[in-house]
C-alpha cells in the first residue's frame, strides 16, 4: 500500500497496487486544512467517530447514519488499544520518545494511522463524503476537530443485554470471572438450554462479582463521557459532539437521525427510509439470546432484576444512573 504526504491532492502518487485501483486511487495525508480530513480514492473524505458503552446502541447509530448516501461508517477499529501503545512508548523517562522531536512525531504517526485506516474503508463506498469508526469505547478524541456521536443507555438495560451476550459467547467480561462458580453454572445452564434465561429471568443476575463488574464499568464510562463532553463544550478539547440517549432515539428515530445528518452538514431529505431489513427501526424481531441482535427494547431490565440485583447495581452505579437522568434517587 503506497502512501504520500502531500497537501496537493492532484500530485501523482503510487496506487494501492494490492487492490489494483488505478493511478488516481490512493490514500494521502493532507497536512493543510482540517485535521480530520484525508485524501482517499480520488477525493477528500472527512472522518468521524461513534462511541458509547457496549450494548448501548453504537451499531444502531451507525446503521442510521448509513441510510444517508454521503456517509459510510465501518468498524470496530479499537484505536484505544493502539493509543495505549503509543502512550507507553512516550511515557517512561528512559524512552527517547518522551522528548522532542520524537514525542511530537509519535503523536503525529498515531493520528496518521487513525486517518488512513478509517479512510481505507472508503473503498467500500466511493460516494461517501464522511467515513467513520463505530467502536464501543469511552469518549476520547483521537483526531482534533473530529465530530463524535456519543450514545448513552440505561445501565440496567446494558447490564441485562451484556450479561446475556457475555454468558452466551464466553466473552471478555465473562472470562474475567470464569472461575466464579455462580457464573460458570449460568453458562452451563445456558448451553444446555438457550431459552434458560427466558424461562428463569431471576437467574441472570445471580453472580455478584460479574453483575457488579458490568455495573461498575458502565458507571465509570458514564462519568468519563459526561466529563469529556463538558470539556468539549467548554473548548478545552478540540472536537464537536452530538450526544443522545438510546431511549430518545428509540422514541423518535426519524427526528434524531435528521439531527445527526445536520450535525455533519448533510441534508436529511437525501437519506433512505428506515426499514426492517436495514435494522434501523427500533428493536429487533424476536428475542434470540444467542444473537448480538437480541431484542433492543427499553426497560427490559424490569424482567430480570431481583431485589438483590437492584442493591448491587445501586451500590456500583446508582449515582451515575441519577446523573444520566434515568432516576431521580436510589428509591427505585
Map each language-model feature to its residues.
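PAPS-dependent sulfotransferase catalytic core
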Residues: 1-119, 125, 168-189, 291
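PAPS-dependent sulfotransferase catalytic domain
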Residues: 31-35, 42, 160-163, 167-259, ...
Amino acid at each position: 500500500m503506497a502512501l504520500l504526504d502531500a497537501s496537493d491532492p492532484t500530485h501523482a502518487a503510487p496506487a494501492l497496487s494490492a487492490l489494483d485501483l488505478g493511478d488516481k486511487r490512493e490514500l494521502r495525508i493532507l497536512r493543510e486544512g482540517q485535521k480530520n480530513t484525508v485524501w482517499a480514492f480520488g477525493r477528500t473524505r472527512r472522518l468521524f467517530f461513534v462511541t458509547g458503552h457496549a450494548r448501548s446502541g453504537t451499531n444502531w447509530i451507525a446503521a442510521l447514519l448509513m441510510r444517508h448516501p454521503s456517509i459510510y461508517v465501518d468498524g470496530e477499529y479499537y484505536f484505544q488499544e493502539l493509543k495505549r501503545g503509543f502512550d507507553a512508548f512516550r511515557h517512561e523517562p528512559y524512552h527517547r520518545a518522551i522528548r522532542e522531536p520524537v514525542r511530537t512525531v509519535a503523536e503525529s504517526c498515531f493520528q496518521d494511522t487513525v486517518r488512513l485506516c478509517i479512510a481505507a474503508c472508503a473503498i467500500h463506498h466511493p460516494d461517501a463524503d464522511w467515513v467513520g469508526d463505530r467502536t464501543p469505547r469511552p469518549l476520547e478524541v483521537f483526531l482534533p476537530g473530529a465530530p463524535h456521536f456519543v450514545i448513552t443507555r440505561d445501565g440496567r438495560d446494558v447490564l441485562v443485554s451484556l450479561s446475556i451476550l457475555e454468558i452466551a459467547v464466553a466473552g471478555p467480561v465473562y472470562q474475567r470471572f470464569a472461575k466464579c462458580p455462580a457464573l460458570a453454572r449460568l453458562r452451563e445452564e445456558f448451553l444446555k438450554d438457550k431459552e434458560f434465561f427466558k424461562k428463569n429471568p431471576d437467574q441472570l443476575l445471580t453472580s455478584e462479582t460479574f453483575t457488579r463488574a458490568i455495573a461498575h464499568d458502565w458507571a465509570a464510562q458514564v462519568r468519563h463521557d459526561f466529563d469529556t463532553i463538558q470539556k468539549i463544550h467548554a473548548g478545552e478539547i478540540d472536537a464537536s459532539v452530538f450526544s443522545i440517549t438510546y431511549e430518545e432515539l428509540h422514541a423518535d428515530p426519524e427526528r434524531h437521525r435528521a439531527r445527526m445528518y445536520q450535525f455533519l452538514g448533510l441534508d436529511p431529505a437525501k437519506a433512505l427510509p428506515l426499514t426492517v431489513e436495514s435494522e434501523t427501526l427500533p428493536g429487533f424481531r424476536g428475542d434470540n439470546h444467542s444473537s448480538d441482535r437480541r431484542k433492543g427494547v427499553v426497560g427490559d431490565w424490569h424482567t430480570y432484576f431481583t431485589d438483590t440485583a437492584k442493591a448491587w447495581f445501586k451500590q456500583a452505579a446508582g449515582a451515575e444512573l441519577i446523573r444520566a437522568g434515568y432516576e431521580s434517587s436510589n428509591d427505585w
